[in-house]
């Protein structure tokens, strides 16, 4: 059981951002909806303080695609600024349903492909986010 009093009285370290990769998009949306609802229901005072700037938002998800080149290689992109934020990345390495094209042939993503995408997003966020989890 979480100590709700500690979570209600604790100060945020940095604004929150959630990066749910394509393999984990649905779970990321559920986590986002829960956090939005939780913060709105528990945050009824201290919202004027500058310490709570960007604490209450309608969406904490960021778009972080990993587009693939024709050779199968990919690059990690962050489509919005994450400077100074606490970035939480979510990935489902066992999601075998995602596919990509390599030299015109359809290829299913392996756990290693998902892990490589996670490393690409971490590299893209390196030195910008306050913390990466």
Report the location of each language-model feature.
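PRPP-associated nucleotide enzymes
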Residues: 1-133
